[in-house]
UniProtKB/Swiss-Prot annotation:
SMART domains: HATPase_c. Keywords: ATP-binding, Chaperone, Cytoplasm, Nucleotide-binding, Stress response. Residues 566-652 are annotated as: C. One of its GO terms (cellular component) is cytoplasm. It comes from the Bacteria. Molecular chaperone. Has ATPase activity. Homodimer. This is Chaperone protein HtpG. The keyword Chaperone applies. One of its GO terms (molecular function) is ATP hydrolysis activity. It is found in: Cytoplasm. It comes from Alkalilimnicola ehrlichii (strain ATCC BAA-1101 / DSM 17681 / MLHE-1). HAMAP family: HSP90. The gene is htpG.
Length: 652
């Protein structure tokens, strides 16, 4: 294999420069995090070597004693973090250290507020990894060699974090990666061994890799000659607890231990909300340690997040994959599963259809849902906090997990017309418990915002009758709710779809009046249909409206208008269906249209009637300028009529 030996100086990706600047100025109170991140990277490199060496033992190069070493040189003002893991090639160094290989980078930068404390917390959630070294270092050098390659394939990367880095080949005798941080005078506190040991024990104590530092012989004098110094330098002591936390009995693990391990595995500053630790023995043996975070991970709304549940086989890290161990609607869960029954050389292809993994996944989902049900029942305030952070993701389970659909639906929370609280806090059980006598269905309305939902004209008759309606303002709500046809034997019905059927709540006198109005205003309905024939499927007298002049209603089995717009924007072909226009026959605007307007004016009034109904649905007008022109014309007409009336009253 040829070696690319030339030296090159390259510019950082633009987002990297911005991120480095933000970190240096925002992580002022959390600088310790740099060591946690570098150790976690080293641990990942060792995990990768362990896994790959199962297929190719030669990668160990005769050295199977895997470890991470942290050392300080006070004279040179350096901290070195070295591992004998998988190492990197030149291309991998350029890819991993010159760019941020994460799709959410731009979104992350957009979320920053300028508030140092808030931004520091967000940066910690994002997981800045290697770049956190520049929070304390004025210069960083990386020496690395990929396992299985010769010493001549070593790579040296160097940068001061100010916009550019150099990349060149060098001789590297040992496999692995060595990161050398040169510290300025202002960061001298980190040149103390005890300070670094404290950070390691706080953040990385439970890493399943020995973290070693030079032994401190407190009962001996300082070495005087070079031989004694060399001997002392070769003596290393392990400073972390290398026993895997999850393998210990729960009775021996303190809450602080669980919290510290969570911060390591999730790269989070905050404590978790809850955790579930289970040892399963029998036909299948495995251990799971699952955490529900207090705050949403940065990649929560990515359907294919980069981080999730880690899979270990007999304490050997195999892979990190959310969906194989946890469904996507629970992608906020962090933690691990360690199985005794999977083969160590298991392939990713085999994992896709592994019955044991399916059983572990099902059991893990059950435990999470059990814990959420318990929280919702016994700790409603904590559950409200959880739902505020993760409810939008949890509700996806209604559409994705048929086996647990009813359980997930029970955990959902909604805003309703009863108190119009924008914070969803009403369960379906709450709704059913206060349904009116004779009410047969659970009613809901979807919209593109909370205000649009609560002000929907479709709610008018329900408010008049005192019937509670669920308000669903999230874009995903309609997709979710179409998969929940009923709950506890009660059908779910949209107030904006199909014909209005209130069952026993329907006022027969009102229904009869609407039928009579349809007959007596037949000419108006036909004329409106003719004026709007390219936009509506029919025009009918409404039994929904009490205050508004008109509303649009789609078919009972059609997508709502908001969902149609979302699907169309996403590039999906939509059927060319048209909504129905329902009119309030008692409204002054509609009555005015029934008084012999000429064709041109009637056409303008009809267009305005349709456009305002479309706007209340969150729709976009095809020709806003034409709409404004028509409205201005109508207002001018009314103003002149009012002026003429005033003049007549004065006798002018």
């Amino acid at each position: 294999m040829a070696t690319d030996a030339h030296k090159e100086t390259l510019e950082f990706q633009a987002e990297v420069q911005q991120l480095l600047h933000l970190m240096i100025h925002s992580l002022y109170s959390n600088k310790d995090i740099f060591l946690r991140e570098l150790i976690s990277n080293a641990s990942d490199a060792i995990d990768k070597l362990r896994f790959q060496s199962l297929q190719d033992e030669s990668l160990l190069e005769g050295e199977g004693d895997l470890r991470i070493r942290v050392s300080v040189d006070k004279d040179a003002r350096t901290i070195t973090v070295a591992d004998n893991g998988i190492g990197m090639t030149r291309d991998e160094v350029a890819e991993n250290l010159g760019t941020i290989a994460r799709s959410g980078t731009k979104a992350f930068l957009d979320q920053l507020t300028g508030d140092q404390q808030k931004d520091a917390k967000l940066i910690g959630q994002f997981g800045v990894g290697f770049y956190s070294a520049f929070v304390v270092a004025e210069h960083v050098t990386v020496h690395t060699r990929k396992a299985g390659l010769g010493a001549e394939h070593g790579v040296r990367w160097s940068s001061d974090g100010k916009g550019a880095y150099t990349l060149e080949n060098e001789e590297v005798a040992e496999r692995g990666t060595r990161v050398v941080l040169t510290l300025p005078e202002s960061q001298s506190e980190y040149l103390d061994d005890w300070r670094l040991k404290g950070i390691i024990r706080r953040y990385s104590d439970h890493i399943d890799v020995p973290i070693q530092m030079p032994a401190q012989a407190e009962d001996k004098d300082e070495p005087e000659d070079e031989a004694e110094k060399a001997e002392a330098a070769e003596t290393w002591e392990t400073v972390n607890n290398t026993n895997a936390l999850w393998m210990r009995p729960k009775s021996e693990i303190s809450d602080d231990d669980y919290k510290a391990f969570y911060k390591h595995v999730a790269h989070d500053f905050d404590d978790p909300m809850v955790w579930l630790h289970n040892h399963v023995e029998g036909r299948q043996s495995y251990t799971s340690l699952l955490y529900i975070p207090k705050n949403p991970p940065f990649d929560l709304y990515e359907r294919e997040p980069a981080h999730g549940i880690k899979l270990y086989v007999r304490r050997v890290f195999i892979m990190e994959d959310t969906e194989k161990l946890m469904p996507r609607y629970l992608r906020f869960v962090r933690g691990l599963v360690d199985s005794d029954d999977l083969p160590l050389n298991v392939s990713r292809e085999l994992l896709q259809h592994n019955p044991l993994l399916d059983k572990i996944r099902s059991a893990s989902v059950k435990r999470i849902l059990d814990r959420l049900e318990k929280m919702a029942k016994n700790e409603p305030e904590q559950y409200a906090e959880f739902y505020g952070n993760f409810g939008k993701v949890l509700k996806e389970g209604v559409a994705e997990d048929f086996a647990n659909r009813e359980r997930i639906a029970k955990l959902l929370r909604f805003s309703t017309t009863q108190d119009e609280n924008e914070t969803p806090d009403v369960s379906l059980d709450d709704y059913i418990a206060r349904m009116k006598e004779g009410q047969e269905a659970i009613y809901y309305v979807t919209a593109e915002s909370f205000n649009a939902a609560r002000n929907s004209p479709h709610l008018e008759v329900f408010r008049k009758k005192g019937v509670e309606v669920l308000l669903l303002p999230d874009p995903v709500d309609e997709w979710v709710i179409t998969h929940l046809n009923e709950y506890d034997g009660k059908p779910l019905k949209s107030v904006a779809k199909g014909g209005l059927d209130l069952g026993e709540l329907e006022d027969q006198a009102e229904k009869k009046a609407a039928e009579e109005a349809t007959e007596s205003h037949k000419d108006l309905l036909e004329k409106l249909k003719g004026a709007l024939e390219d936009k509506v499927s029919e025009v009918r007298v409404s039994t929904r409206l009490t205050d508004s002049p008109a509303c649009l209603v789609v078919g009972e089995y059609d997508f709502g208008m908001g969902m149609q717009r979302l699907l169309k924007a996403a590039g999906h072909a939509m059927p060319q269906g048209k909504p129905a226009l329902e009119i309030n026959i008692d409204h002054p605007i509609v009555q005015r249209m029934d008084t012999g307007l000429d064709d041109a004016r009637f056409s303008d009034w009809a267009a305005v009637l349709y456009d305002q109904a479309l706007l209340t649905e969150g729709g976009q007008l095809e020709d806003p300028a034409a709409f404004v022109k028509r409205v201005n014309a109508l207002l001018t007409e009314q103003a002149r009529a009012g002026e003429a009336k005033s003049n007549a009253a004065r006798g002018d």
